[in-house]
Amino acid sequence: MSMSTHMPTPTPSDTKKMPPKEKKNKDDRPYKCTFCDKAFHRLEHQTRHIRTHTGEKPHACTFPGCVKRFSRSDELTRHLRIHTNPSSRKRKNKNQNMMINPNATTATTTGPAGMAIPTSNLPPGSYAIPNTAIPFSIDRNGNHVYHQPYPVYFVPHANGYMQPMVQTQGVTVVPNTDQQQHQQQQQYHQQQQQYQFQERPQHQQQQQTNIGTNNHLQQNGSAVFSLPSSPTMASAQTPNSGTSSSSESIKLAPLSIPNNISRPQQQQQQQQQQQQIPKSESSTSLYSDGNKLFSRPNSTLHSLGSSPENNNASGPLSGVPTPSFSNLNDYFQQKSNSNNSRLFNASSSSLSSLSGKIRSSSSTNLAGLQRLTPLTSTTNNTNNTTTSNTNNNNMTKPSIIPKQPSSTSLNLEFYNGNNQQQQNYHTHKKSRPNSPSQTPIHLSSSRKSANNSFIISPNETPLQTPLQSPQLKPYQDQPPTNVNINVSAPSDTFIGTAVTEKLNNISSIAGNGTQLPPIRSVLSFTSLVDYPDPKQKNVAPPVVDTTNVARGETNGSNGNNSNAKPMSLTNLLS
């Protein structure tokens, strides 16, 4: 029983001792708030509490793009967990809501200037990065200065990459890749076409060798030489509205072939396209006797001159033998028979044939103008022996025609009697003044004349006699002081009478040039007797007056033979 009495029993006073300890703890809070009655055991608790009164938030979020700030560090750490470990359940719910009803949500994000940007306008499946600013400096008041960047939205693309969508002043700009790709393809094709048309002389030869060389070898046809101004017979008989030049059709052929077609299919399509291409009107291709195609890489440079020397200068194509040019003569022969005139001279490599043809066939009034202005020629025949060779590549002058001495033609030019001017004047005469000249151009001719009308001169029309008798004019080999009149013995001073087809000494005429034979070789004066006046027997023979000899009158220096009969052609032949 004593044991039980010594056992202490709890009293209510013992239980009352615990609250004084709690009071003691309250009294031990030395850190009191200056703005309110709260006291804290630790200093950091007091500073955190004071920040609620001042609004200071020194703890900023370190995540890029986040601008949130906190007064407590524990709040910052809690906030960082949202960026580093977001809940996947919330994201899935948001995406499902956007897919089911994209227009129902009216969530907004803040813009650069504080304006709201509705996220419902964004395409489905896209997400927006909020407009966040990163502080880059602190002003003097201690405030942070931030950039205001534009929000960038990433829109999922069908090809698998994200396309940026920039927000500028509340207007969303979404680049349309389909339109851009289409425009870029069009610009690329246009640039390729322009580059090919500008570089046609360089690339045409390469493209023709690459595109179906065997198809060219299989083409059959006669020898055809196409010119821009003279289309081929096939194209002239059957005109086709869909015809195009061979160079353009060959160049545009590879552009129309898709890229996903295999190599044999491309070759088949190329052969089909080339079979559909008819003979062009502006190509300069030659089909030789071996059924092989030879195409000119530059049609403009060789369209005016078609000599074999120029055609051989370009060199043969790779894989295509050099064609023979023996069919050019047949081409020009056929053109001369059909059109009675040719536009080009096969043996000329310059513009002289073209310019001469244009001048001769353009109009008929130019020939009349040349009758009014006589054509002057050189007087020396020996200096002009190589005019046909030297003038082969030169332009012919319309006002001066140099003489061409010939050993097989008659030179029917007549000289003046003046000693000061030894010039030759051609006599022009056209049978039909208003009709254009249709004189064919021969392959052997080396140049074109300025006028194709009838000319007495044998330079243009050899072996033709004039239609009228020429005018009688005297010719003097010696000075007029030594010339004497002796009718009984005819002298060499009278030449230039009518020349007919009964001339006996043609070789002497050709050898002397334009000088005609003496009259005694043509006519016989043995039956003619002069009837001189008896008073004039002992008088010295007078000097011939060159101005009146053509009329048949001779006046002496003393003027005493005025009674003599006039010497005309009719009196001499009677």
From Swiss-Prot:
Q: Where is this region: Disordered?
A: 1-29, 83-119, 175-250, 262-470, 547-574
Q: Which UniProt keywords apply?
A: Carbohydrate metabolism, DNA-binding, Metal-binding, Nucleus, Repeat, Repressor, Transcription, Transcription regulation, Zinc, Zinc-finger
Quick check: keyword Metal-binding in the entry? yes
Primary location class: nucleus
The record's Gene Ontology cellular component field reads: cytoplasm; nucleus
Q: Which GO terms describe its molecular function?
A: RNA polymerase II cis-regulatory region sequence-specific DNA binding; zinc ion binding
Question: Compositionally biased, Low complexity: which spans?
Answer: 97-119, 179-208, 265-276, 336-363, 376-396
Q: Which family does it belong to?
A: Belongs to the creA/MIG C2H2-type zinc-finger protein family.
Q: What does this protein do?
A: Involved in glucose repression of glucose metabolism genes.
Indicate what this protein is called per its UniProt record: Regulatory protein MIG1
Native source species: Candida albicans
**What is the gene called?**
MIG1
